[in-house]
Amino acid sequence: MGDAESTKDRLLLPVERVENVTWSDLRDGSFTVELKRLIFFAAPMAAVVIAQFMLQIVSMMMVGHLGNLSLASASLASSFCNVTGFSFIIGLSCALDTLSGQAYGAKLYRKLGVQTYTAMFCLALVCLPLSLIWFNMEKLLLILGQDPSIAHEAGKYATWLIPGLFAYAVLQPLTRYFQNQSLITPLLITSYVVFCIHVPLCWFLVYNSGLGNLGGALAISLSNWLYAIFLGSFMYYSSACSETRAPLSMEIFDGIGEFFKYALPSAAMICLEWWSYELIILLSGLLPNPQLETSVLSVCLQTISTMYSIPLAIAAAASTRISNELGAGNSRAAHIVVYAAMSLAVIDALIVSMSLLIGRNLFGHIFSSDKETIDYVAKMAPLVSISLMLDALQGVLSGIARGCGWQHIGAYINLGAFYLWGIPIAASLAFWIHLKGVGLWIGIQAGAVLQTLLLALVTGCTNWESQADKARNRMALAYGT
């Protein structure tokens, strides 16, 4: 009891008062040290994100060789499942970016393990209604006016993805468990081992098991479970996790309220942005020549989704470092992380966007051999390059927000920026001004501009001493429970 009281007292000690960090304060070498730390975190994390992203891509590629019906149904099912399930699980699990990151910074190591189990339990509960939606996908797609044959095959594909959804509910908290301790090597090794298993497994299930396109869905489900089992084994057996491991106990139920307090706005923040881009693809189907418009916008979305792995990795690094430093009461260090992370974001934005702009005439050939599609994609390339710049900036700013626990602010910003500003502009330009797909993309990027500006304003006006105080008080309260 005495140890518990002393720990709580330590957490309640006032944070050292320092003035806000300026560029002149960064000449002491702390900025360079933090920049290197973020790079060593973000580089392997980007590889992890790409390896995870490639699981669906590999399944889609193999299913695509079975015919147009198989490809169309798998694409529709994957899009539906991403929107109604996987995006929601990812969003909910981002609560741990705040809770576990700050707990680790405050040296409440055991709390990290307990929070991970709490998240698994909560996400498993959420998967129950989501799986019912997936199980009835065929009926829902028919109500939405989809082709009956495509809806039937998509419904079967989604049903075989349901086991993978529950695996995802285990996998995402485990990923955050390692990420918040800056243990990226287990994530890197595991992701590539699973990817190397997934490729032959998917090939066998699609072409040699008699399952056909359903084999692609089963391969994703099995690979997700393998990923979760490998990470869980590392957590259980590795000495690197000895301080943060916690036994299963009734204590996991004590943190359910705290988890959902951050999980629900986290999910809203992630899903509102994710769904806005999916809505743009749906709107493109209402334009004249919908096949061309939808194909081109899908190529643009696929491009920015792939390139987003880099800012997503930087955001993960920034979120972890900021939450750790705030939990430790180091407000100045957290502020320096912001400078370093945004510097990396600007560098990424310039390199990636300029590369696409220079190679815009080759851009379309990667995705299509149709001349009309290639020319249209080349026309869209300057707009996509702007999108890549905005994604780099807002992605890292969103990571900073998660590290500080501003998910509710981020949710309001995304709601206003995309649904009250960007999408109305997109619809107006596309259908009233007749700019078609270009108008849709300009509109959604208008939303991204407003989102980036508002997130930057919130970050720039932050009192970092106050944020450190809030984090320490939150940890003291949690420790007291």
From Swiss-Prot:
Keywords: Membrane, Transmembrane, Transmembrane helix, Transport. CDD domains: MATE_eukaryotic. One of its GO terms (molecular function) is antiporter activity. Its main location: membrane. The keyword Transmembrane helix applies. GO terms for cellular component: chloroplast; membrane. It is found in: Membrane. The chain crosses the membrane at residues 38-58, 76-96, 117-137, 154-174, 187-207, 214-234, 267-287, 296-316, 336-356, 380-400, 415-435, 438-458. GO terms for biological process: xenobiotic detoxification by transmembrane export across the plasma membrane. This is Protein DETOXIFICATION 12. Belongs to the multi antimicrobial extrusion (MATE) (TC 2.A.66.1) family. The keyword Membrane applies. It is a multi-pass membrane protein. Pfam families: MatE.
